[in-house]
């Protein structure tokens, strides 16, 4: 017979602090799955192409930082235990993406964005606020966010040099996972956000992508 552990508010705050450090500190996120890039050949790219791919992967890495913070914030304030558990499980899956992107960025001779702590804090606050409103809104926010991420991944896949199979393999697997997260959130009862809200979210996403491409 299995028992479910019940965490106190202090326990949850400590867990959130631990997850924040694992998300933001270099090389601290250990993936549960090996990177899809491992089995792909190295690419011969020009310096300009390498810088561009590094910028794209930096954007994707920051996107995963935001997703991690969003899930953690929602898990902290979710009202139903099953919703909280779903958020925590999704956050664990995002650790893979976080680690894969960082590994690829380092391979390309670059670094994650210095703005990650800022975006983590903002996303955590948004996630916690959504959870306070209702679990339905919280799940809907997950779905809308993941659909936005899928659009960015599609755009980045089109921009990758044809020979960069390592980055392509990572983004393709991330695309599959993010779509699954979005559909799972809707299936669990998530609210489908109207077009104006999704448009506002896309504007905020553009701020993140423009700023993290270079820094």
From Swiss-Prot:
Q: Where does the record place it?
A: Cell membrane
Which of the seven top EC classes does this enzyme belong to?
Answer: oxidoreductase
Keyword DNA damage assigned to the entry: answer is no
Keywords noted in UniProt: Cell membrane, Iron, Membrane, Metal-binding, Monooxygenase, Oxidoreductase, Ubiquinone biosynthesis
Q: How does it sit in the membrane?
A: Peripheral membrane protein
A GO cellular-component term linked to this record: plasma membrane
**Main location group:** membrane
The family annotation for this protein states: Belongs to the COQ7 family.
Question: Which named protein is this?
Answer: 3-demethoxyubiquinol 3-hydroxylase
Source organism (scientific name): Pseudomonas fluorescens (strain SBW25)
């Amino acid at each position: 017979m299995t028992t479910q552990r019940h965490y106190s508010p202090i326990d949850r705050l400590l867990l959130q602090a631990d997850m924040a450090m694992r998300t933001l500190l270099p090389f601290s996120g250990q993936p549960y799955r090996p990177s899809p890039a491992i089995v792909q050949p190295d690419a011969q790219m020009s310096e300009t192409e390498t810088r561009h791919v590094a910028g794209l992967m930096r954007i994707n890495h920051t996107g995963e930082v935001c997703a991690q913070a969003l899930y953690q914030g929602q898990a902290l304030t979710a009202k139903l235990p099953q919703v909280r558990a779903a958020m925590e499980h999704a956050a664990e899956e995002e650790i893979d993406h976080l680690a894969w992107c960082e590994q690829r960025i380092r391979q390309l001779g670059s670094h994650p964005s210095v703005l990650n702590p800022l975006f983590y804090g903002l996303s955590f606050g948004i996630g916690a606020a959504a959870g306070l409103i209702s679990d339905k809104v919280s799940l809907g926010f997950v779905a809308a966010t993941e659909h936005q991420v899928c659009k960015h991944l599609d755009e980045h896949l089109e921009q990758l040099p044809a020979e960069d199979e390592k980055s392509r393999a990572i983004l393709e697997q991330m695309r599959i996972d993010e779509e699954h997260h979005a559909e799972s959130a809707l299936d669990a009862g998530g609210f489908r956000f109207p077009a104006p809200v999704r448009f506002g979210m896309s504007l905020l996403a553009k701020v993140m992508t423009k700023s993290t491409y270079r820094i």
